[in-house]
C-alpha cells in the first residue's frame, strides 16, 4: 500500500526539521503555520466581497461590514495571536514535549491521517458545543463571550475574534485530538490548517452551493453558524449539527429554514 503512504515526503520533512530545529518548529513554527493558515483562509473570502457575481451567495446581504469594522477586527485578532496565543504556546512548550509531541516522528499513512483529522473534528466539536453553550449563560456571556458576538453578520476574520480567556478555553478542544491519536508535528499542522479553514469558512458570511463539505453528513457550514451570530442563540456546535439536533438547540434554525424554503418553492411554482 505504498501509494497510501507519506514516505515519499518524509526525507523532505526531516530535512526541514533538521534545518530549523525541532524546538523552534514546535513553538514558533506552529505559530507561523497558524498565521499562514488563518490569514490564507481569510483572504479568498475577503476577495469575494469585490466580486459582484458572488454577492448572491451572501447569507446576510443587507448587512455590510464597514472598512473600519473590518480593520478593527483584523487588528484585535492579530494582537490576540501575538500576545495570547504565542505566549501560551511558549509557556506550554515543556509540557507538550513531555507528553511526547515530536517533529521527527515517522509520518502517518494517508488513511490514518484522515482518520485522525476526522476524530479531531468530532472531539473538538463535542468539546466546543458544551463549552460554547455554557458561555451563553449569565456572567460568562456578559463578560467573556459577548466579545465574539460584536459582529451579528460575521466575516472570515471574526472566527478568532474573542476575549483572551475564551481563546484559551476553546483552544483546549483543538489540541485534545492530536495528542490522543497522533503526537507528531506534521499531523498537528495538517489538523490546524484544516480546522482553521473550517472555522474561517464557517464565519465567512457566504454559503456556496458547490462547497464539497455539503456532502459530509451532519456538517453545519456557514449558513448553520451564521444563524447563531444573527440571533445569538442555538446552533452551538463548531462543525457538525447532530448535537444541536439531539438537544433541540437548532429547532429555531430549522423552523426558519423550513419557512424560507417553502417561500422559495412557492415563488418558483408561480
From Swiss-Prot:
Pathway: Steroid biosynthesis; zymosterol biosynthesis; zymosterol from lanosterol: step 3/6. A motif (Histidine box-1) lies at residues 132-136. A motif (Histidine box-3) lies at residues 224-230. It catalyses: 4,4-dimethyl-5alpha-cholest-7-en-3beta-ol + 6 Fe(II)-[cytochrome b5] + 3 O2 + 5 H(+) = 4alpha-carboxy-4beta-methyl-5alpha-cholest-7-ene-3beta-ol + 6 Fe(III)-[cytochrome b5] + 4 H2O. It is a multi-pass membrane protein. Its cofactor is Fe cation. One of its GO terms (biological process) is sterol biosynthetic process. Residues 118-249 form the Fatty acid hydroxylase domain. A motif (Histidine box-2) lies at residues 145-149. Keywords: Endoplasmic reticulum, Iron, Lipid biosynthesis, Lipid metabolism, Membrane, NAD, Oxidoreductase, Steroid biosynthesis, Steroid metabolism, Sterol biosynthesis, Sterol metabolism, Transmembrane, Transmembrane helix. It is an enzyme of class 1 (oxidoreductase). It comes from the Eukaryota. Its EC number is 1.14.18.9. The chain crosses the membrane at residues 31-51, 82-102, 110-130. The keyword Transmembrane applies. GO terms for molecular function: C-4 methylsterol oxidase activity; iron ion binding. It is found in: Endoplasmic reticulum membrane. Pfam families: FA_hydroxylase. Belongs to the sterol desaturase family. This is Putative methylsterol monooxygenase DDB_G0269788. It comes from Dictyostelium discoideum.
Amino acid at each position: 500500500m505504498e501509494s497510501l503512504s507519506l514516505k515519499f515526503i518524509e526525507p523532505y520533512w526531516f530535512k526541514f526539521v533538521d534545518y530549523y530545529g525541532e524546538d523552534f518548529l514546535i513553538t514558533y513554527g506552529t505559530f507561523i503555520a497558524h498565521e499562514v493558515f488563518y490569514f490564507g483562509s481569510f483572504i479568498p473570502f475577503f476577495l469575494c466581497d469585490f466580486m459582484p457575481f458572488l454577492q448572491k451567495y451572501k447569507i446576510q446581504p443587507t448587512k455590510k461590514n464597514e472598512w473600519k469594522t473590518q480593520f478593527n477586527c483584523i487588528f484585535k485578532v492579530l494582537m490576540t495571536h501575538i500576545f495570547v496565543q504565542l505566549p501560551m504556546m511558549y509557556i506550554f512548550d515543556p509540557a507538550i514535549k513531555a507528553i511526547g509531541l515530536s517533529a521527527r516522528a515517522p509520518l502517518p499513512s494517508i488513511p490514518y491521517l484522515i482518520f485522525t483529522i476526522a476524530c479531531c473534528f468530532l472531539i473538538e466539536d463535542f468539546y466546543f458545543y458544551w463549552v460554547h453553550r455554557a458561555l451563553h449563560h449569565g456572567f460568562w456571556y456578559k463578560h467573556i463571550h459577548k466579545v465574539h458576538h460584536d459582529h451579528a453578520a460575521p466575516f472570515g476574520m471574526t472566527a478568532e475574534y474573542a476575549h483572551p480567556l475564551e481563546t484559551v478555553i476553546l483552544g483546549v478542544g483543538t489540541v485534545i485530538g492530536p495528542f490522543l491519536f497522533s503526537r507528531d508535528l506534521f499531523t498537528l499542522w495538517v489538523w490546524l490548517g484544516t480546522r482553521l479553514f473550517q472555522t474561517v469558512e464557517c464565519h465567512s458570511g457566504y454559503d456556496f452551493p458547490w462547497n464539497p463539505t455539503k456532502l459530509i453528513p451532519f456538517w453545519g457550514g456557514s449558513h448553520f453558524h451564521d444563524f447563531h451570530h444573527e440571533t445569538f442563540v442555538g446552533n452551538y456546535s463548531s462543525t457538525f449539527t447532530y448535537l444541536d439536533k439531539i438537544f433541540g438547540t437548532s429547532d429555531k434554525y430549522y423552523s426558519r429554514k423550513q419557512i424560507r424554503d417553502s417561500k422559495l418553492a412557492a415563488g418558483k411554482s408561480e
